[in-house]
């Protein structure tokens, strides 16, 4: 059992929790995720690690209530316990293995959309702790849905906030802001890291390809069971089949087949769609308790 030591509602239907999990906190790296189960019979819910504190032995998760599992999790309070908290899982962000001095010579831009701000934060924080200043674009549909602005502002070299409706700061999308920085403000970037909704990552990656900026995306949104068994996170990258929760979650943003992934993501929301995928691709497994037949 794992204790919930703090809980906050960041904005409407988006929650943050600090979970007491010393072993996970000790080994966690930026870019990784965990699998949480509310109770012994509950669904497996994969969530990106939004922060970790090795001294306190806590791991921070951020989630949006979009299905049965996350709605049940949102009903938990401080002092309650969840049944399972497994991790860290997935491949850590590629840059943590690079030479620090070489990283300092590069210009990085992070683009976070919506709840994508949470998985972007530990990467930006890691950069800040190692003396590497990075630019961050934080985008949302409107001001009320923005999260992690204060945290990212402290860790980023420069933070650019955008809202689709213009209710706060720059009016436009993250792509619009990136275009403004490069084309009108003379910014030059050696690498872009993009995390957010699939459609946002698709169009922002199209822009970075046009601008000649190597790009990494995190495909956390398409994960269901977190082991690759259910096949929901199956994605084609550079013509090869990959599984986001095992081979990723990070991939070359210019090689991902976003349209295929979004189609599969939509089909996995219905039993009819899952059946059709089994006809097209074969039954990836016998649904042995992975949780893929439920929603998060």
From Swiss-Prot:
GO terms for molecular function: 2 iron, 2 sulfur cluster binding; flavin adenine dinucleotide binding; oxidoreductase activity. Pfam families: DHODB_Fe-S_bind (PF10418), NAD_binding_1 (PF00175). Gene3D superfamilies: Nucleotide-binding domain of ferredoxin-NADP reductase (FNR) module, Translation factors. CDD domains: DHOD_e_trans_like1. Transmembrane segments: none annotated. Residues 1-95 form the FAD-binding FR-type domain. One of its GO terms (biological process) is pyrimidine nucleotide biosynthetic process. PANTHER family: DIHYDROOROTATE DEHYDROGENASE B (NAD(+)), ELECTRON TRANSFER SUBUNIT, DIHYDROOROTATE DEHYDROGENASE B (NAD(+)), ELECTRON TRANSFER SUBUNIT-RELATED. NCBIfam families: PRK06222.1. This is Uncharacterized protein in adh 3'region.
């Amino acid at each position: 059992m794992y204790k919930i030591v703090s809980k906050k509602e960041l904005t409407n239907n988006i929650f943050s929790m600090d979970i007491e999990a010393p072993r996970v906190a000790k080994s966690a790296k930026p870019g990784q995720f965990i699998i949480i189960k509310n109770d012994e019979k509950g669904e497996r819910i994969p969530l990106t690690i939004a922060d970790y504190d090795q001294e306190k032995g806590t791991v921070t998760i951020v989630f949006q209530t979009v299905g049965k599992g996350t709605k049940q999790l949102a009903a938990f309070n401080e002092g309650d316990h969840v049944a399972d908290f497994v991790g860290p899982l997935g491949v850590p962000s590629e840059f943590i293995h690079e030479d620090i001095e070489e990283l300092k010579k590069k210009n990085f831009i992070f683009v976070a959309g919506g709840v994508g701000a949470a998985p972007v934060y530990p990467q930006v924080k890691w950069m800040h702790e190692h003396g590497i200043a990075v630019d961050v674009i934080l985008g949302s549909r409107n001001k009320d849905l923005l999260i992690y602005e204060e945290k990212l502002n402290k860790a980023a070299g420069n933070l650019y906030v955008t809202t689709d409706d213009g209710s706060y700061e720059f009016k436009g999308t993250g792509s619009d802001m990136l275009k403004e920085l490069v084309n009108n403000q003379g910014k030059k970037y050696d690498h872009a890291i993009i995390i957010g909704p699939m459609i946002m990552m698709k169009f922002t990656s199209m822009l970075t390809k046009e601008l000649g900026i190597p790009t990494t995306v995190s495909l956390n949104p398409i994960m269901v069971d977190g082991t690759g068994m259910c096949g929901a996170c199956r994605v084609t990258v550079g013509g090869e089949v990959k599984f986001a929760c095992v081979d990723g979650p990070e991939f070359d943003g210019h090689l991902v087949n976003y349209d295929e992934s979004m189609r599969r993501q939509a089909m996995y929301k219905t039993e009819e769609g899952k059946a059709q995928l089994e006809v097209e691709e074969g039954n990836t497994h016998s649904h042995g308790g992975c949780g893929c037949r439920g929603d998060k």
